[in-house]
């Protein structure tokens, strides 16, 4: 009888665990507000999550050769929970390239200040793919090349044409200046509009 009860409890726990939604990156990451000492990473997830960014210098070392600093999306000391994540990374050296990994932990239960239950953690896969990189601005640089794109109004063909040579030219940054869509009625339209 004890064996039967143990098996039933194990199966129930397994069923509950399997039934939990899995947190994954839905869109992004995108870099914003790049300065000489930092940058902001923005992305969305498939479910509500708590998030953070792990940063390492681009020095050829294994990403996990040492404990890497973690930067959190927080407000007055409390980690924000949601599907849209904005993590500011600061205190970096000017004109330096950094590798980063985005991480999120799914929220299974959110009762505000009473209780928050976090589920599995998931991050960008740096073992199978190269980590994302960001380079801080260098004020000592003689010149900066940037491209500005705007008034696309969901015309993907124009967008692709304007950015056709970017990979070869390697501008320091590309700025999306607005009017990427004529109107926005849904989140889906924002990400699939171009």
Question: What are the language-model segments listed below?
Answer:
Residues 1-23:
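Bacterial Sec-dependent N-terminal signal peptides
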Residues 18-148, 167-168:
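Acidic, histidine-bearing metal-coordination/catalytic regions of metal-dependent phosphoesterases
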Residues 141-194:
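Active-site neighborhood of divalent metal-dependent phosphoester/pyrophosphate hydrolases
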């Amino acid at each position: 009888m004890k064996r039967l009860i143990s098996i039933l409890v194990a199966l129930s726990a397994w069923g509950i665990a399997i039934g939990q939604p899995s947190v994954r990156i839905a869109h992004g990451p995108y870099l914003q507000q790049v300065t000489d000492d930092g940058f902001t990473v923005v992305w969305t997830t498939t479910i509500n999550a708590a998030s953070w960014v792990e940063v390492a210098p681009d020095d050829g070392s294994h990403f996990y050769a040492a404990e890497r600093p973690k930067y959190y999306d927080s407000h007055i000391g409390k980690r924000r929970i949601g599907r849209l994540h904005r993590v500011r990374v600061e205190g970096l050296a000017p004109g330096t390239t950094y590798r980063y990994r985005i991480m999120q932990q799914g929220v299974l239960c959110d009762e505000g200040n009473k209780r928050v239950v976090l589920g599995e953690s998931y991050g960008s896969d740096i073992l199978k793919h190269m980590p994302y990189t960001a380079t801080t601005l260098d004020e000592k640089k003689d010149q900066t090349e940037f491209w500005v794109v705007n008034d696309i109004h969901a015309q993907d063909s124009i967008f692709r044409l304007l950015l056709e040579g970017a990979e070869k030219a390697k501008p320091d940054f590309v700025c999306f200046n607005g009017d990427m869509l004529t109107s926005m009625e849904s989140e889906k339209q924002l990400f699939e509009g171009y």
